[in-house]
Curated annotation (Swiss-Prot):
Primary gene name: gcvPA
Similarity field: Belongs to the GcvP family. N-terminal subunit subfamily.
Pfam families on file: GDC-P (PF02347)
Signal sequence extent: none
GO biological process: glycine decarboxylation via glycine cleavage system; nucleoside metabolic process
Quaternary structure and partners: The glycine cleavage system is composed of four proteins: P, T, L and H. In this organism, the P 'protein' is a heterodimer of two subunits.
Functional summary from the UniProt entry: The glycine cleavage system catalyzes the degradation of glycine. The P protein binds the alpha-amino group of glycine through its pyridoxal phosphate cofactor; CO(2) is released and the remaining methylamine moiety is then transferred to the lipoamide cofactor of the H protein.
Protein name: Probable glycine dehydrogenase (decarboxylating) subunit 1
A single MF term (Gene Ontology): glycine dehydrogenase (decarboxylating) activity
């Protein structure tokens, strides 16, 4: 009787072992030292395989051990809770989209390609940039790719970054650029928490500066207010400018394109993506219409063309940049991307529209400043005095661990600990006035003993 071709069994295993010239599966691990091999059964709570129903009961038992917060977390740090409309969830669960497979065959992928083209178009309009790729992993990876783009263009090794940039992004960049010998040099902040341009001017006299990075707003939520001046300095020195920007903040501030920024990066998490222990996210990367910049872009780019019959069609373009075509000569080794998340962002942006983004940004600004005002009533002041959006850092002048643990006892998650006494709070449209008031009263109780 023939064996089923897709089910593993002893005969197949024997044939595979014979074909590679070993006698047993143990021989495959001969290079692993004996002292670190596991030579006993796994110490599990159950001694036999479980049925599907028993597994579900076990998982529910574990799930019930989780504590549930009574309100969205106030945890800052670059990823914040936002409301995800039901239509976004519905559309990305459709079988036509629910895959990360790259649409190499345009003749059977017009729907997916058009959806990604719409995403690129919407981001281009929001950022006022001209070329957008079809997504990267997250903000950190997009920034690393932008820095390596700059390095490939001008061959220089130093990148000036704000001291108050997102530290998690900085760690990603250090990891990605280590092999290239790229050096990050921090620009100190002023008392407002923005880039100290007087210090910057003395730092960019070096001939080896490849790029200047500006984060808008920065890790502390503070708006940079001298971007035009920084860009002007960079252009005079022929230094590439990179801006990382919060998409929702663009409902209040000038987009990167108005500053003539060379490369823009960001994260689409706030454009219709839920928080799931930090992922999946959506790396955004956009450039000016410049041949050098576009040719050095990483990732997929969807273009609009016409077929042999003159009909409109969508297809992947400039594919000779990519690793499946060029291998080690590619602009990046990034492959399966965040296409599903890009479609979610496209649906979200289409749903809100230009006016919706402005109204949402205004609401976030008002609520976050209300929270800051209420904290000031308790004698808790911000670390920097610059204007901010969504996130702000405060100094409690006492051990924040004590405050945070007491908040958790009330099922309230406070801000991100920055130091012994400081924390970064995030307030968005999902935090109502009553939630903010309850947070303040809970902190007041901690202060009163």
């Amino acid at each position: 009787m023939d064996m089923h071709p897709w089910l593993p069994n002893i005969k197949y295993i024997e044939e595979m072992l014979k074909s590679i010239g070993v006698n047993s599966i143990d021989d495959l691990f001969i290079d692993v030292p004996e002292e670190i091999k596991l030579k006993k059964e796994l110490d599990l709570d159950y001694k036999k395989p479980l049925s599907e129903y028993e597994i579900i009961l076990k998982l529910q038992e574990l799930q019930n051990k989780n504590k549930r917060l009574k309100m969205p977390p106030f945890l800052g740090g670059g990823l914040c809770p936002h409301y995800v409309p039901e239509v976004v969830k519905f559309i990305i669960k459709r079988s036509e989209f629910y895959t990360a497979y790259t649409p190499y065959q345009p003749e059977i992928s017009q729907g997916l390609l058009q959806a990604l083209f719409e995403y690129q178009s919407l981001i281009a309009e929001l950022f006022e940039m001209e070329v957008v790729n079809a997504s990267l992993y997250d903000w950190g990876s997009a920034l690393a790719e932008a820095i390596m783009m700059a390095n490939r263009i001008n061959k220089k090794k130093t990148v000036l970054v704000p001291k108050l940039m997102n530290p998690y992004h900085k760690e990603v960049v250090k990891t990605w650029t280590y092999g290239k010998g790229i050096k990050l040099v921090e620009i100190p902040p002023n008392e407002r928490g923005t880039i100290d341009v007087s210090k910057l001017e003395s730092m960019i006299n070096e001939d080896d500066v490849s790029a200047i990075y500006i984060q808008q707003p920065n890790f502390y939520g503070i708006f940079e207010d001298e971007i035009e001046y920084i860009v002007d300095i960079a252009k005079k020195k022929k230094i590439i400018t990179i801006m990382g920007v919060s998409p929702l903040a663009l409902g209040l501030i000038k987009p990167p394109g108005e500053y003539e920024i060379d490369i823009t990066v960001g994260d689409g998490q706030e454009l219709g993506l839920s928080l799931n222990f930090g992922g999946p996210l959506l790396g955004i990367l956009a450039t000016r219409w410049d041949g050098q910049l576009v040719r050095q872009m990483p990732g997929r780019i969807v273009g609009l063309t016409k077929d042999s019959e003159g009909k409109r069609g969508f297809t992947l373009i400039l594919q000779t940049r990519e690793q499946f075509a060029r291998r080690e000569k590619a602009t990046s080794n990034i492959t399966t991307n965040e296409a599903l998340m890009a479609i979610a962002a496209a649906v979200y942006l289409s749903l809100l529209g230009r006016n919706g983004i402005k109204e949402l940004a205004k609401e976030i600004y008002i609520r976050s400043h209300y929270a800051k005002k209420r904290l000031e009533e308790l004698g808790v002041n911000t670390v920097y005095n610059g204007d901010f959006f969504e996130e702000f850092a405060v100094d409690f002048r006492t051990d924040y661990d004590i405050i945070h643990s007491r908040l958790l006892e009330k099922n309230i998650h406070g801000g991100l600990k920055l130091g012994k006494t400081q924390a970064l709070f995030c307030v968005t449209e999902v935090h109502t006035k009553s939630m903010i008031d309850e947070l303040i009263e809970s902190i007041r109780e901690v202060f009163s003993g």
